[in-house]
Design a protein with these regions (language model features):
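Residue-level signature of outer-membrane beta-barrel architecture
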Residues: 27-29, 110-112, 162-164, 173-175, ...
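Flexible, small/polar- and glycine-enriched "cap/hinge" segments at structural transition points
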Residues: 125-127, 132, 157, 161, ...
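Repeated loop/turn-to-beta-strand initiation elements of outer-membrane beta-barrel proteins
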Residues: 32-34, 116-120, 162-171
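Outer-membrane beta-barrel "beta-signal"
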Residues: 162-166, 192-205
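C-terminal outer-membrane beta-barrel translocator/porin domains of Gram-negative envelope proteins
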Residues: 1-112, 123-126, 130-133, 137-142
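Strand-loop-strand
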Residues: 136-164
Length: 205
């Protein structure tokens, strides 16, 4: 009763209260003949804080990891939170729950011309999402700790870009080599026989 009476409302409806802060640092270095080759790097950090009416950041505002604009060696929303691994579903049916209020990511990519509007890339990605307060549903595996470096999902791959006057169609084939969902000591797992194909419009960074 007391918590309900203290809740803030607008037009008779209770609303969510939260704040988010993102840092997205990108650096591109061009080199080679006519500066046609490029090293592109990106560092991303995001944090969401719920307060007032809300115990958690609204689902649609939480972070996820994996996919063509994230860690490309993992399917979209299939990475994390933390060291959590979904062992109950083989068809990724529970991917909607794999979000968190903390996200860290790093990417590096070497881009080079092939022929005409065809361009290539070699890249590596690392990242994950966590929760600042552990969710009992994840048995504490989702909580952010000082051991976060060992909980990063990592992968590498190659890509083909079709770049027509700035309109880019992108294909990336990536495989994981560090999976935080595996038991500690077994996470360095080179799965080049099980790559993930990503399709996207535009560059990821």
């Amino acid at each position: 009763e007391s918590s309900t009476s203290a809740s803030k409302e607008f037009l008779g409806l209770e609303y969510a209260q939260y704040a988010k802060a993102d840092v997205d640092f990108r650096y591109h270095f061009n080199f080679g003949r006519n500066k046609e080759q490029k090293i592109a790097t990106r560092l991303f950090a995001g944090y969401g804080l719920a307060y007032g009416n809300s115990d958690v950041v609204p689902f649609v505002k939480q972070y996820f990891s994996g996919g063509p604009y994230s860690v490309r060696a993992f399917n979209i929303r299939s990475l994390g939170p933390g060291t959590y691994a979904d062992t109950t579903s083989e068809d990724n049916s529970s991917f909607f729950d794999r979000t968190g209020n903390i996200r860290l990511e790093a990417n590096i990519e070497y881009r080079f011309p092939i022929y005409s509007f065809f361009k290539g890339a070699v890249f590596a990605d690392a990242g994950n999402v966590w929760n600042s307060v552990g969710n009992p549903s994840f048995n504490g595996q989702d909580k952010f700790t000082s051991n976060f470096i060992n909980e990063l999902g990592m992968g590498a791959g190659v890509g083909l870009r079709i770049d027509v006057q700035g309109f880019v169609i992108r294909f990336d084939l990536a495989a994981p080599f560090h999976d935080p969902g595996l038991p500690e000591g077994e996470r360095l797992d080179f799965r080049f026989d099980d790559p993930v194909l990503n399709f996207a419009i535009g560059y990821s960074f």
